[in-house]
UniProtKB/Swiss-Prot annotation:
It catalyses: L-glutamate = D-glutamate. Its EC number is 5.1.1.3. InterPro entries: Asp/Glu/hydantoin_racemase, Asp/Glu_race, Asp/Glu_racemase_AS_2, Glu_race. The active site is at C77, C186. It comes from Trichodesmium erythraeum (strain IMS101). GO terms for molecular function: glutamate racemase activity. Keywords: Cell shape, Cell wall biogenesis/degradation, Isomerase, Peptidoglycan synthesis. It is an enzyme of class 5 (isomerase). Pathway: Cell wall biogenesis; peptidoglycan biosynthesis. Transmembrane segments: none annotated. Substrate binds at D14, S15, Y46, G47, N78, T79, T187, H188. This is Glutamate racemase. The gene is murI.
Length: 270
């Protein structure tokens, strides 16, 4: 691969700030890589959308990312990974990676009674259940769809008593099943970790698929000779609406306030 190709950005997308958990992992594990982050804030949350809507959104976003010159695309959104990855990855000329298989492979190394909290769309797809049982058919899996988590996080209500109450309600079935491992089936959910840890037994192991995905990214970049060995470019942030709100939330979650551009999909594709 040419130096120019290796210096291209990795494209990441999510419906909102959830994918920043993947971005943080990229900064930690692959600090030399340049990133283009897209948040489809005009159409969030994805977790209550239909499969057809998700497929349309994902197709538009990846088309735009590829036109923007990325060398790889990361679906930093479990709903997209669950419903669209297999359908779109052969359509584009860049590698497209999702969260679910890396997360499932890590989960089965941790425990035998695995709970998955996810958006309703991800839970209904059974993508994590299938991936976990494919990795190890002897484990047990329980999934809970959590429709209110993403809106609460995007509205910056992490410390609201109502959020704690909702978390308690969602976790109750998993506590009753005595899970030993909890998988974040949505990239937004690591922001809830203090609340979730306070509700679950201390012995429960938390699995963040973002960590597992970035390990896979590192391996793929090496295999494909796409690792950047030059100084990385500053991360570019693009949203489909509410740039100020996104920047303010990013300050809390990343520790710095990014410059955020706004584009309108699908208008940008014409």
């Amino acid at each position: 691969m040419t130096t120019e190709t290796r210096q291209k950005r990795i494209g990441i997308f999510d419906s909102g700030i959830g994918g920043l958990t993947v971005l943080r992992e990229l900064y930690r594990q692959l600090p030399k890589e340049s990133i283009l982050y897209f948040a489809d804030t005009a159409r969030l949350p994805y977790g209550t959308r239909t499969t057809e809507e998700i497929l349309q959104f994902v197709d538009e976003i990846i088309t735009w990312l590829v036109k923007s010159g990325v060398k790889m695309v990361l679906m930093a959104c479990n709903t997209s990974s669950a419903l669209a990855l297999e359908k779109v990855k052969s359509k584009f000329d860049v590698p497209i990676l999702g969260l679910i298989v890396p997360g499932a492979n890590t989960a089965v190394k941790q425990g035998k009674r695995i709970g998955v909290i996810a958006t309703p769309a991800t839970a209904a797809s059974n993508a994590y259940r299938y991936a976990i049982l494919e990795a190890n058919a002897s484990v047990q899996v329980w999934q809970v769809g959590c429709p209110y988590f993403v809106p609460l996080i995007e509205q910056n209500q992490l410390h609201d008593p109502y959020t704690y109450q909702i978390a308690e309600e969602y976790l109750m079935p998993l506590i009753q099943q005595q899970i030993d491992t909890l998988v974040y089936g949505c990239t937004h959910y690591p922001y809830l970790e203090p609340i979730l840890r306070s509700l679950l037994p201390k012995s429960v192991i938390f699995v963040d698929p973002a960590v597992s995905l970035v390990k896979v990214v590192a391996r793929e970049l090496k295999i494909m000779n796409l690792e950047n060995d030059k100084t990385p470019k500053p991360t570019k942030f693009v949203v489909s609406s509410s740039p100020q709100k996104f920047a303010d939330l990013s300050l809390q979650l990343l520790g710095y306030k990014p410059d955020v551009q706004v584009i309108s999909l699908p208008a940008m594709l014409k």
